[in-house]
Design a protein with these regions (language model features):
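Short, small-residue-biased leader/transition segments that mark boundaries at the very start
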Residues: 1-3
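Extracytoplasmic beta-rich repeat domains
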Residues: 7-19, 58-83, 87-94, 112-142, ...
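Surface-exposed loop/turn positions within WD40 beta-propeller blades
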Residues: 26, 35, 94, 154-155, ...
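Blade-level signature of beta-propeller repeat domains, shared across WD40, Kelch, NHL, RCC1
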Residues: 27-29, 37, 41, 182-219
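Short loop/turn segments immediately following the C-termini of beta-strands
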Residues: 34-36, 145, 153, 196-198
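Short loop/turn segments that connect beta-strands within beta-propeller blades
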Residues: 102-103, 163-165, 217
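A structural motif specific to WD40 beta-propellers
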Residues: 108, 167-170
């Protein structure tokens, strides 16, 4: 027995996992958010056993896509609702970054977040920087100077946006994904940004083991 249903937003959010960034000086909340549907199925114990489904405790790292629910008559499978081309079954954008006015609670800007540079039909990277809007995992940092700095998207870029308008100010390609929030600080009168560039195996972004730093010009 198998009962299927679609979930939208999917299990990965809305705005789950990454959290939000707050700019109290300008009264803004910044958030990267998903538009990715999931398909989940209620599956009988017999079929789960036939599929070789294991819980995380039984097989760490091998439970992706299964909700085993040991001791129950049913478990579940779940995952993004994908086409035969290995692309989501709805049109892009699949992810946005948005600015919200905390006083009025209105979305003052929103734009697709992430390109298809490392993604495409059948898993073939498109190598284009068209902002299709990808799912993302991770958050960023909003500075007092009105800049939001964030990696998180599937295309291995880190970006800086104008927090008040959403204008893209800067971006740089990374050797792996940045799924952890960047850190910013000032030392000797100069502002720095530091990010862990380690990737994530379940997004997936490219894995790495780097810590990278950037600084504003001294003048």
């Amino acid at each position: 027995m198998c009962i299927r249903d679609r979930v939208y937003p999917g299990h990965h959010g809305g705005l789950n996992w990454g959290g939000v960034m707050v700019d109290p000086k300008h009264g803004l909340l910044l958030v990267n958010n998903q538009r990715l549907p999931y398909m989940q199925s209620l599956v009988s114990r017999e079929k789960l056993d036939a599929l070789g489904a294991k819980s995380f405790q039984e097989a760490p790292g091998q439970s992706k896509g299964f909700r085993v629910q040991q001791g129950q008559a049913y478990g579940a499978t779940k995952g993004p609702w994908m086409s035969v081309l290995d692309q989501p079954c709805i049109a892009p954008p699949w992810g946005y970054i948005s600015g919200i006015d905390l006083r009025t609670r209105e979305v003052i800007w929103s734009r697709p977040f992430g390109t298809g540079y490392d993604n495409g039909p059948m898993g073939i990277p498109s190598r284009t920087q068209w902002e299709i809007g990808t799912p993302s995992d991770g958050t960023g940092v909003a500075t007092a100077g009105g800049v939001t700095i964030i990696g998180a998207a599937l295309d291995q870029f880190i970006r800086a946006f104008d927090s008040q308008t959403g204008e893209l100010l800067w971006q740089q390609r990374l050797p792996a994904g940045n799924q952890a929030a960047p850190l910013t600080y000032i030392a000797n009168g100069r502002q720095y940004v530091v990010a862990v560039v380690g990737g994530h195996d379940r997004i997936p972004t490219r894995l790495g083991d780097s810590i990278m730093a950037w600084a504003l010009p001294q003048k």
